[in-house]
């Protein structure tokens, strides 16, 4: 099976969209939780959980899956990690803006 440039570009767009969706979901859930539970600090736990899941996906792709499928799973893990970090930073920016 051969991959054309169009098919390879489709894979990258899926990975970028996954990272963006993860960031948006993290920021949205974080803002909603801050509105419902202003005393509790849960975004840090969500960030830690998503980073652990991303690292686990990368480890699993390296050890068990391997090959191109493993590379795609590893990229998905990186996107979850960076999406979670971006969502956390977006949440911090929103909270700073709301305080003003």
From Swiss-Prot:
Q: Which residues cross the membrane?
A: 11-33, 45-64, 68-90
Q: How does it sit in the membrane?
A: Multi-pass membrane protein
Under Pfam families, the record lists:
YesK
The record's subcellular location field reads: Cell membrane
Q: Name one GO cellular component term.
A: plasma membrane
InterPro entries the UniProt entry points to? YesK-like (IPR025434)
Keywords (alphabetical) are: Cell membrane, Membrane, Transmembrane, Transmembrane helix
Quick check: keyword Transmembrane helix in the entry? yes
The molecule here is called Uncharacterized protein YesK
Originating organism = Bacillus subtilis (strain 168)
Highest lineage ranks of the organism?
Answer: Bacteria, Bacillati, Bacillota, Bacilli, Bacillales
